[in-house]
Amino acid sequence: MEGARLIIEEINKEAEQKIKYILEEAEQKAEKIKQEAEKKARIKADWIIRKAQTQAELEKQRIIANAKLEVRRKKLVLQEELINEVIGAIKDRLLSIPEAEYMEILKDLIVTGIRELGEEKVVLSSNGETLSLLKAHLKEMEESVNEKLGKDITISLGEPIETIGGVIVQNLEKTIRIDNTFEARMERLQADLRTKIAKILFG
């Protein structure tokens, strides 16, 4: 009986050791699985955070880019509004200038045109009213132009053209022309205005 009891105790002892070993091994495996799971979770969490940060940065850059485009668009609209406002004011002023002042402006435009043309015999074209005004003061205009340029300039009047004012100065053959109509002058002014306003708005 004593021998049987000892054998049973030995069996129980071995069983307990095996159970202990199995439990320890199970705990180790469980800890390893837990650590790997935590590691994977951290990696995934880091990836999610990085992805979110990247997406947030991209969204921020997109918003900034769109805002810059919108600001530029508004500046361009403002630029055109300012140019149109200035040109409109000039047009209104030109359409209401007194005759004496208009004659002085015409003289300056004619002198400038003749200088650029480099001819002593020229033909002037403008609207009907301006041509009638020049016709009535042609001798006086020639004398003023000659005095200004120090040359003997001969001025002829051409056919009426569509313009709000100013003149086109041409050679006799009408192969070379200097467009000093108000529209042409304003077009040149418009380009200059656009440059100046753009410099103010866009730096």
UniProtKB/Swiss-Prot annotation:
Pfam families: vATP-synt_E (PF01991)
Main location, first listed in the record: membrane
UniProt protein name: A-type ATP synthase subunit E
Domain of life of the organism encoding this protein: Archaea
Membrane topology, from the record: Peripheral membrane protein
Family: Belongs to the V-ATPase E subunit family.
Gene: atpE
Annotated localization: Cell membrane
Species for this entry: Thermococcus sibiricus (strain DSM 12597 / MM 739)
Record keywords: ATP synthesis, Cell membrane, Hydrogen ion transport, Ion transport, Membrane, Transport
